[in-house]
Amino acid sequence: MRSRARTHVATLLLSAVLASAALAVGGDPAHARTPSPSPSPSSAFRPPASVDGGAWSSGHLQGTAIDRRRGHMYFSFTNLLVKTDLAGRPIGSVTGLTGHLGDLDFNSADGRVYGSLEYKAAQAFYVAIFDGSRITRMNMDARTTDVLSTVHLREVVRDYTADMNGDGVFDGDTGNTPDHRYGCSGIDGVAFGPGLNGRGGVRLTVAYGVYSNTTRTDNDHQVLLQYDVRDWRKYERPLSEDALHTSGPASPDGKFFAYTGNTTYGVQNLEYDGDSGNWLMAVYKGKKAAFPNYGLYVVDGSKPARRGEVKGQPRPESGRILSLLPRGLHHEPSGVYGYESGGQYGLVSLDDGRYYVAEAGTVDSGGTTLQTGRAVLHRWTGAVPNPFAVRGPAG
C-alpha cells in the first residue's frame, strides 16, 4: 500500500482545491465538505458524460468502478467482469464466474478492483480482487488465469447460516424463514472509505444483502462490515469453484448497523463520497408498510457510530449504530431519511460533487437478449426526491 505520509500530504494539498471547486458547483447544505482519507483525483481529470459498458450474454449489471489515473472503467455483470476505456471501448473481460459478482470499488492504494462474490449454495462468501493491469484481452478465465484472487468472509457465513429458530435445520437460500441473522442473504455493496467508528484509516466496507421479509422485525437494519485490507495478501487465494477455500480474517474490524427498514436484498451499491464525507447506500425498495422504502439512504459521515440498540432482535442486542443524514425525504413515524434515485446498478463518486450513476438494460441481438450497462455522469444537488441531476463533462 502506498505510504500513509504520501497519502496524507496529497490530501492536504488538494483539499483546498476540491473545496473551492465544490463550492462553485453549489448544492445542498447537507453536502458538508470534510477531508477525504482517500487520494484526491487529479484536477486534470475530465470525465466523459457517459461510459458505455457494452452488451453481453450475462447477468444484469451489478456495479461499476473507475480507475481515474489509467482511464479505465469496470462493469460487473453478475457472472462477467468487463474492463473498458473511458470511451467505452472494451479492453478485456473476465469470465468463468458461476457465483454472483456484485458491487465493485477501485482501491487506489494497490491499484486493484474489489468486488463482492457469493456462492450461496455452498455457503461461501468472498471479496473478489481483480488485478486490472493483467486484464488485457477478452474472455480471460477467472479460474485459469492470474487476474483474480479471493478472500473468504467468515462473519458473513456465520450470520447467513444462523439457525435463528433453533430447530436444527438451516433453511437455505430463501427469505421465507426465520433463519439468517439480521435477515442476511449474503453480501453485495462494497466501498473504500474511513473507519465508521471515527478513528480514521482507510477500510474496505462490505454491506450485507438482506432478504425481503415483512413478517419479521429483526431485518430492518443495513449491516456494514469494515476490514483493514493492508495485510490481506496473506489470505488471498486463487478461485477454485470445485474446492472453495476458507482463507480470510476470523472477524471484521468493525460491524455497524443503519436503521432504514427492511429492503429487498440490502445494499446493492455502497459508495463513500470524499467530498461530503458521507456514505451512500442504493437499494432495491423494501415492502414493509411501516417504513418509507426509499431507494437511497445516506449515512452521516460526520457522526461516528455510537453504541445503541439493534432494534427488533429476538433478544436485546446492542451494536455500533450509524446515523442517517437528516436531509432529503423524511418519514416521521419511523424517523428514517432518504431519497428516491438510481444507483442500484452502479454508483461511483468522483469526490467533487459528481457521480457516475449506472443504468442497466437489455437489447435484442438476433433473438438473444443481451444485458447492457452505462455509467452516466451526474452532479449532487441534494434536491428531493432525486438528489442527482444529469451533468455533461464540461461543467
Feature names for model-found ranges:
Residues 46-53, 135-187, 229-264, 308-341:
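Surface-exposed loop and turn segments in beta-propeller and other repeat-based domains
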Residues 66-70, 106-110, 194-200, 273-276, ...:
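Residue-level detector of Asp-centered blade-edge/turn motifs that repeat once per structural unit
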Residues 1-33:
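Secretory targeting and sorting signals
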Residues 87-125:
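Blade-loop segments of beta-propeller domains
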Residues 124-143, 217-240, 292-314, 369-394:
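Beta-propeller blade signature
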Residues 79, 118-120, 133, 153, ...:
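Residue-level signature of beta-propeller blades and closely related beta-rich strand-turn architectures
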Residues 49-79, 100-103, 195:
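Beta-strand-rich domains and repeat architectures in extracellular enzymes and scaffolds
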Residues 58-63, 100-101, 120-122, 163-194, ...:
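Signature of short aromatic-glycine-proline-rich micro-motifs recurring in repeat-based ectodomains
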